[in-house]
């Protein structure tokens, strides 16, 4: 077991994510000796970032929820901040996966442990796929690498069979950062070389207790590293009781004014305030989180992380078990499209909105195609935090 320091990781993940050309020359950063903390740069250091490759998963479903499998690269239109982009790589479920599984092992989820232990065989049989590999990180009061990347199904299943709970902390955001660092060392597919899709699967409560990392920092780096996040939410009573409630207080200030001061360097609007308070549109909350990466974000972090990277969040409730959720995630991963492009014609800094649409020729003569639903990652943010 390798214990991962609570500091670290963000700069390593960011530099690898934003320079895919380097990945062809090296297998990744030199691993530190066990127990050696990675040196952190100053907190106020400015980060210079250039994004040379963007990947987005694309899921297309009809009005009954069935996935559409008949589309090709020419059927998709991609824009980055409104500027059309040229597709460099297109795939439909064929690129092998590099998967990092984050498993909460706090005492808070002890009652779920028998169900979580059964997840290993599902991950190897339905999620990894042919030529897939997986690594496992457990987290509670600490973040531990339980298994490095391996193709060996027996090793992965053994880790799940021997999971044990620890303290009551849930360092979710630190664990996300550690997982992003692992995935950032894996080569991405381009137009002229094969690569791997970077996927993170989180099995946890929608709660963070004790992380040194903020949610927005982890999400921003996941986006820049082209990591797609799927999450299986463990619905514990304690998690629901400790979750920060949405702001539902009545408006007592005059119209056009706000009851609290603005965040430094920002202009207050109804949308920005709703995103900050966790009561607004999911898309606005994602944008707010990556723009204000060092500030706390309200709302369900598992849902925000999945939506912010093009993945999906499945809560365990009623008749949906952990096994059912993982099975659904595996089915989607191996039937979705993946598109890569090199951003051109847009400003480097700031938030980049990714939009995906279908060419008219793709749906010509197809009944009910106007009701098809497209899901992709909404964008990414380049530049230092605004606050």
Language model features by range: what are they?
Residues 1-6:
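N-terminal secretory signal peptides that target proteins for export/translocation
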Residues 23-387:
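Scaffold/interface architecture of coatomer-like assemblies
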């Amino acid at each position: 077991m390798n214990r991962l320091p609570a500091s670290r990781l963000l700069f390593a993940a960011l530099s690898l994510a934003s320079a895919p050309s380097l990945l062809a020359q090296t297998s990744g950063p030199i691993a530190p000796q066990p127990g050696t903390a990675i040196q952190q740069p100053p907190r106020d250091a400015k980060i210079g970032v250039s994004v040379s490759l963007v990947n987005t998963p694309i899921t297309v479903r009809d009005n009954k929820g069935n996935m559409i499998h008949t589309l090709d690269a020419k059927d998709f239109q991609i824009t980055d901040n409104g500027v059309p982009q040229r597709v460099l790589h297109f795939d439909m479920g064929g690129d092998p996966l590099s998967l990092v599984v984050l498993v909460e092992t706090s005492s808070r989820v002890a009652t779920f442990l028998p169900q979580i232990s059964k997840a290993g065989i599902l991950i190897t049989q339905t999620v990894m796929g042919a030529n897939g590999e997986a690594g496992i990180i457990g987290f509670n009061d600490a973040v531990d690498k339980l298994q490095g990347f391996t193709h060996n199904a027996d090793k992965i299943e053994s880790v799940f069979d021997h999971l044990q709970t620890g303290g009551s902390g849930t360092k979710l955001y630190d664990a996300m950062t550690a997982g992003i660092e692992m995935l950032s060392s894996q080569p991405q597919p381009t137009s002229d070389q094969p690569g791997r899709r970077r996927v993170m699967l989180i099995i946890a409560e929608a709660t963070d207790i004790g992380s040194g990392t903020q949610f927005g920092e982890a999400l921003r780096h996941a986006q820049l590293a082209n990591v797609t996040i799927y999450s299986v939410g463990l619905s514990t009573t304690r998690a629901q009781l400790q979750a920060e409630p949405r702001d539902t207080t009545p408006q007592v200030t005059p119209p056009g004014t706000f009851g609290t001061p603005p965040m430094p360097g920002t202009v207050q609007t109804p949308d920005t305030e709703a995103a900050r308070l966790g009561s607004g549109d999911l898309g606005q909350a994602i944008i707010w989180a990556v723009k204000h990466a060092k500030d706390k974000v309200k709302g369900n972090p598992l849902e925000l992380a999945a939506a912010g990277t093009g993945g999906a969040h499945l809560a365990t409730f009623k008749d949906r078990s952990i096994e059912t959720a993982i099975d659904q995630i595996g089915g989607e991963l191996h039937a979705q499209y993946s598109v890569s492009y090199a951003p051109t014609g847009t400003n480097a800094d700031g938030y980049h909105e990714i939009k995906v649409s279908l060419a008219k020729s793709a749906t010509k003569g197809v009944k009910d195609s106007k009701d098809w639903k497209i899901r992709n990652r909404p964008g990414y943010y380049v530049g230092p935090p605004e606050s």
